[in-house]
Amino acid sequence: MTKTAKVNDIVRDWVVLDAKDKVFGRLITEIAVLLRGKHRPFYTPNVDCGDFVVVINANKVKFSGMKLEDKEYFTHSGYFGSTKSKTLQEMLEKAPEKLYHLAVRGMLPKTKLGKAMIKKLKVYRDDKHPHTAQTSKKDAK
């Protein structure tokens, strides 16, 4: 019989990922897999069985091609003429946390379960983070 995961049986780990000199898309894919729990043998789609993920050195990630200048992110408040855009370079300098959340959110389910998963993602610009107590028992990847 196939064993399904129960909410009470899940033990969540804290995984620290260093984004320095890693390709952004591949890093985001790895984060999404860890948040969903697809790396576990008892993965169940309707249960949040993923780990907590801490990303350090978020603004030192690499992009291929001319994405830093060409890729744009748009926001709209709902009023006429209020469309604003920022390039990837501006987003990376001003708010790398938001950039990671936007990219990972696109790979997670668009449900309440997806919102619970994205709350387990912690992104920090440099190598200092307040989660050393949770992650001290393991080495950083």
Curated annotation (Swiss-Prot):
One record GO biological process: translation
PROSITE patterns: RIBOSOMAL_L13
GO cellular component terms attached to this protein's record: cytosolic large ribosomal subunit; ribosome
A Gene Ontology molecular function term of the record: structural constituent of ribosome
Keyword vocabulary terms for this entry: Ribonucleoprotein, Ribosomal protein
Gene3D superfamilies linked to this entry: Ribosomal protein L13 (3.90.1180.10)
Membrane spanning stretches: none
PANTHER family in UniProt: LARGE RIBOSOMAL SUBUNIT PROTEIN UL13M, RIBOSOMAL PROTEIN L13
HAMAP family in UniProt: Ribosomal_uL13
Assembly notes: Part of the 50S ribosomal subunit.
Recorded family membership: Belongs to the universal ribosomal protein uL13 family.
Function: This protein is one of the early assembly proteins of the 50S ribosomal subunit, although it is not seen to bind rRNA by itself. It is important during the early stages of 50S assembly.
Protein name as catalogued: Large ribosomal subunit protein uL13
